[in-house]
Amino acid sequence: MADPNEQQKQDLHKEEPFEEEPFQEDLYEEDLYEDDDSEEDLYEEDLYEEDDSEEESIPFEYSATVTPGAAEMTELLSRGSIEILGLMPWSSNGTYLVQVTRGEDYAPAIYKPERGERPLWDFPGALWKREVATYELSRSLGFGSVPTTVARVSAPMGRGSLQAFVPALFSEHYFTLRDRSELAEQLKTLCALDLIANSADRKGGHCLIDEHNQIWAIDNGLSFHEEAKLRTVIWDFAGEPLPNRSAEAMQHLLETGLGAELVELLTPAEQQATLRRTQQVLAEGHFPFDRTGRSYPWPLV
């Protein structure tokens, strides 16, 4: 009889042939970086809408027996039954708010099925696997920057990712958080994660903060491309040294490897590119510059 766990691994990832691509190093060439006023224009308030209303409430009554960062969340999301509550508004892909229940435990979550993804000309499909991979990378590094995210093969609309819903302060985003000194270390950690994951869509609104001042990174599907595609709003730390904790975690990753979970989710080319990025960031020892002024997502929030 076939092993169902082995079959699930095959369903999650099919190995493909690849040609190794060199790692793009120009982000670290400071002499090529033009320090002019054009970059600062991207931060002007008139380029994104600031919500002047009072603190927003969650669009439904949040209730859960398991919190987003709890160890029990992985078991709940991996094995719980899924009930679709509704379609999330303003999402570029099919994204659903769901309720996950297992025994007496329950929590809301975000479900992103593969069948709801819009094809992209410059990015491979199965973005949901990259959502899971970003969580697994954050977990393996000990960063804790991404809400618990699991792969579900059996789900209402087919295979996809399931991520713990964060009851965040939704009026907040990166541009309201970056000047708070007590959050700097968390933001630097997230910046380091995005460098390794090659995040191509780190908008300001993808940085959430909860009532405990924990920063969470969501919408991580555009990541782990084997080509250099870094696009992020987090450039405030350019030239600053990597935090010791982040550097030590990267070194440990290089010594121990990506781990079985990431290997199942990424192609061999993506795995090698991830390790090359880690080596490069660690070797440089500081956060890179955007020498082009174009490595930003749009819209910014």
Segments (PLM) and residue ranges:
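Intrinsically disordered, low-complexity mixed-charge segments
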Residues: 15
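Phosphate/dinucleotide-binding and metal-coordinating scaffold of catalytic cores
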Residues: 1-11, 26, 31, 41-301
